[in-house]
Amino acid sequence: MTVRIGINGFGRIGRNVFRAAAARSSELEIVAVNDLGDVPTMAHLLAYDSILGRFPEEVTAEPGAIRVGDRTIKVLAERDPGALPWGDLGVDIVIESTGIFTDAAKARSHVDGGAKKVIIAAPASGEDFTVVLGVNDGDYDPERHTIISNASCTTNCLGVLAKVLHDAVGIDSGMMTTVHAYTQDQNLQDAPHKDLRRARAAALNIVPTSSGAAKAIGLVLPELAGRLDAFALRVPVPTGSVTDLTVTTRRGTSVEEVKEAYAAAASGPYKGLLSYVDAPLVSTDIVGDPASLFDAGLTRVCGPQVKVVGWYDNEWGYSNRLIDLATLIGSSL
């Protein structure tokens, strides 16, 4: 069965999701996108990407549609998600990637329009279920869960890092810092912003700011609820981020034991979600990788303190998790 997908919001994540689906999934079909931008601009930004390069097929704009190779994708321009004709288009799952409709009550408008399920590409409020693949996807219940949050890009990396370490040696408490690429929420030049640090020029500064990843961990790993705290350092790179997790463990361990746990996870149950690397990487090395990467060489143990580091492409990796999640949900429709 081919699962029919609608994308609401054709920005960085929406276009990355489109590319990820085109690159690797014959089980999913993108049938429509909704965005208030004009069609020629949307087609151009899909065809030419500053990070991912040229789209591998010809992309052209048509009246009310984008043509990609021999496929035609309908383009809608509705402000109100409840007015979208998902039912008429036969859409099974909507990927909500505007960053606006993160409240489940608003996202549910897609269901009112005929979609069967909604995946919110962000942390959400009031959702039926928040999922990090490899951590709690086994708890997904198609009968009870209609509005599903895919958490954040950082939570997807942190969740796997924390789960593997917690299963191996037990986590008592910890701190996480994500050194994160700048995003559209920041300013190109100094300008007003509700977060006065994010008000500063993104390409010129290291910008300390908040991260909701620690709170979200409690949703996907309830045994760690309230045990982790976190913040972010936004840095002047366009994509490619790294999570530094430092914890107090419940028992003594060694660098070798920690590495062995991650090596086993990467070659076993987390294959495709987590890779194990010994090479001395920098951020550009992981751009375009769909998995999070455990950097074995940065592992440290000092008494009861353990530090582990995981890289992730905050755009491409997260978009691939959205495709994985849509495939999982689609398998039980």
Curated annotation (Swiss-Prot):
Quaternary structure and partners: Homotetramer.
One GO CC term on file: cytoplasm
Similarity comment: family membership: Belongs to the glyceraldehyde-3-phosphate dehydrogenase family.
Gene3D superfamilies: Dihydrodipicolinate Reductase, domain 2, NAD(P)-binding Rossmann-like Domain
Keyword annotations: Cytoplasm, Glycolysis, NAD, Nucleotide-binding, Oxidoreductase
PANTHER family registered for this protein in UniProt: GLYCERALDEHYDE-3-PHOSPHATE DEHYDROGENASE 2
Gene Ontology BP annotations: glucose metabolic process; glycolytic process
EC numbers, comma separated: 1.2.1.12
Residue positions of the active site: 153 (nucleophile)
Main location: cytoplasm
Involved pathway(s): Carbohydrate degradation; glycolysis; pyruvate from D-glyceraldehyde 3-phosphate: step 1/5
MF terms in GO: glyceraldehyde-3-phosphate dehydrogenase (NAD+) (phosphorylating) activity; NAD binding; NADP binding
The name this protein goes by in its record: Glyceraldehyde-3-phosphate dehydrogenase 1
Lineage of producing organism: Bacteria, Bacillati, Actinomycetota, Actinomycetes, Kitasatosporales
Induction details: In the presence of pentalenolactone (PL).
Site (Activates thiol group during catalysis): 180
InterPro entries named among the record's database cross-references: GlycerAld/Erythrose_P_DH, GlycerAld_3-P_DH_AS, GlycerAld_3-P_DH_cat, GlycerAld_3-P_DH_NAD(P)-bd, Glyceraldehyde-3-P_DH_1, NAD(P)-bd_dom_sf
Residues at which D-glyceraldehyde 3-phosphate binds: 152-154, 183, 198, 211-212, 234
